[in-house]
C-alpha cells in the first residue's frame, strides 16, 4: 500500500529553531552550525494511527528579506508548523503580529500547530541571565497554550531539537492534523467546458 503524502510547511522568526527541528526529525542529527535558510525541502516517513505517511517538509526563511519569496512555498500545504523560540519572547509576539496573518492569508483553513522550540533553554542559567538584562524571561508553557487558543491553532507543542525531547510528538500531531483536515475538506474543484 502506497504511503499517503502530506505537505508540511514550517514558519517562524529567523533563528527560532525551524531547520534544527526538521533536520533532527528527518535525519536524526542536530546541526551545530547556524546557516540561515532560504528554501530547503526534506522528506520523512512517519506512521500515525496505523497509517504510513510521507511528509514533505518545506523549510522557509524567517528573515524579512524573504517575505516576498516565502509565499511560493504555501500552495497545496496540508499543515503548518508555526514556531517561536522559548528563549525569545519577541518571537512569540510575532506569532499574532506577522505569522498568523500571513499564513491565514495564503493558507486559509490549513491546520496550524503552534510549536515552542528550544524548550531546553527555559531553565538554562545563561539564557535566563541574558533575558533578565532585557527585562524579559523565557516563554512559559501557559503563554504558549494561550497563544495557540488565540490564533485558533489545532494544537500546541513544545520541543527541544537539541535533546530530541518532544520532536516526534510535534510531527505526530502535525500528521494527525493534516489527515483530519483532508477528510473534512469538501472538494471545490470545478470543470470548465
Swiss-Prot record:
Main location: membrane
SUPFAM superfamilies linked: P-loop containing nucleoside triphosphate hydrolases
Changes after translation: (Microbial infection) Glycosylated at Tyr-34 by Yersinia ruckeri toxin Afp18. Mono-O-GlcNAcylation by Afp18 inhibits RhoA activation by guanine nucleotide exchange factors and blocks RhoA signaling.
GO cellular component terms given for this protein: cytosol; plasma membrane
Sugar-modified residues: 34
Record's subcellular location: Cell membrane
Protein name: Rho-related GTP-binding protein RhoA-B
Species assigned in the record: Danio rerio
Gene expressing this chain: rhoab
Amino acid at each position: 500500500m502506497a504511503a499517503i503524502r502530506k505537505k508540511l510547511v514550517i514558519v517562524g522568526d529567523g533563528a527560532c529553531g525551524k531547520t534544527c527541528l526538521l533536520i533532527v526529525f528527518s535525519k536524526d542529527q542536530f546541526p551545530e552550525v547556524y546557516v540561515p535558510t532560504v528554501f530547503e525541502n526534506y522528506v520523512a516517513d512517519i506512521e500515525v494511527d496505523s497509517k504510513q505517511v510521507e511528509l514533505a517538509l518545506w523549510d522557509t526563511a524567517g528573515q524579512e528579506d524573504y517575505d516576498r519569496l516565502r509565499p511560493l512555498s504555501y500552495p497545496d500545504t496540508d499543515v503548518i508548523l508555526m514556531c517561536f523560540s522559548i528563549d525569545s519572547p519577541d518571537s512569540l509576539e510575532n506569532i499574532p503580529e506577522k505569522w498568523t496573518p500571513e499564513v491565514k492569508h495564503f493558507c486559509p483553513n490549513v491546520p496550524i500547530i503552534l510549536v515552542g522550540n528550544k524548550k531546553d533553554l527555559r531553565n538554562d542559567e545563561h539564557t535566563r541571565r541574558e533575558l533578565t538584562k532585557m527585562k524579559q524571561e523565557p516563554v512559559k508553557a501557559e503563554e504558549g497554550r494561550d497563544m495557540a487558543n488565540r490564533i485558533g491553532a489545532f494544537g500546541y507543542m513544545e520541543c527541544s531539537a537539541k535533546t530530541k525531547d518532544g520532536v516526534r510528538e510535534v510531527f505526530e500531531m502535525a500528521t494527525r492534523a493534516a489527515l483530519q483536515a483532508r477528510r473534512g475538506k469538501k472538494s471545490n474543484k470545478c470543470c470548465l467546458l
